[in-house]
Amino acid sequence: MTDTLELVRTLSDTEWAELAGRLLTGWFPRGRDTQRRPAGDWSVWLILTGRGWGKTRTGSEDLVDAAITQPGDYAVVAPTFGDARDVCVEGPSGIISVLNRRCVAHNWNRSLGEIALANGSRIKVGSADEPDRWRGWNFRGGWCDELGAWRRPDAWTQLRLATRIGDRPRLVVTTTPRPTTLLKDLVGRTDGSVYVTRGATWENEANLSPAALDELRTRYGGTRIGRQELEGELLLDTPGALWSLAQFDAPGFRAAEAD
């Protein structure tokens, strides 16, 4: 007990805030390891997983953690404002639910699309369909939901340009994989700036309907849509194409080099 008290006395205000947030929510012991922010010097955490994996809850918990422990402005961007409001903010796994569970005082201004916390943090909620609305902001971080469904990839550019405050501004991306140019670029980064978490729907079976999972396995198991939407696989081949990327890379496909 003495050692524990000594440890508690050494906690900084920021560490106290983080500990309190985790203890109040119950997320720390229940969330899977892959749902917790990874260590490292990354700028983008790309969560590329199947439906029902727990992307929304992960994005909400991570953003609330950041807003509590590092006061500042944060962004939440989804394909449309309705998606951001109904899923990321007001949904059962959304930000409001997480804030209420943690007993964190907040004010959600629905008309402005803005959540204000008592510590001064602001969470700006908006749409990827309006990229110019992200000009002029100075964000510490943000959450980008369903990046694979964004119709305006320049929204990502504007958000990256606006995320520039703090020692390490970071963006968390939660999306079901689609072979867009932007997602393929992020997955292909080799400089350590992007940390990729992959996962399948089945990893969250404890929180999903067994009957629904059985039906999904039966109907979509082994199919192209199942590989993308359930297994979380980024499919780079074009359906119906004469050749696939895997065939090009197969042993014996390429001609041997001349001596």
Where are these regions (language model features)?
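Pre-P-loop entry segment of helicase/translocase ATPase cores
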Residues: 1-44
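Short hydrophobic/aromatic beta-strand immediately N-terminal to the Walker A/P-loop
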Residues: 45-48, 75
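Walker A/P-loop NTP-binding motif
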Residues: 56-71
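Conserved RecA-like ASCE P-loop NTPase motor core of nucleic-acid helicases/translocases
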Residues: 72-84
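Inter-Walker segment of RecA-like/P-loop motor cores
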Residues: 82-140, 234
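Walker B catalytic acidic pair
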Residues: 145-147
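ASCE P-loop NTPase helicase motor core
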Residues: 149-221
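ATPase catalytic-site recognition across NTP-hydrolyzing enzymes
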Residues: 205-259
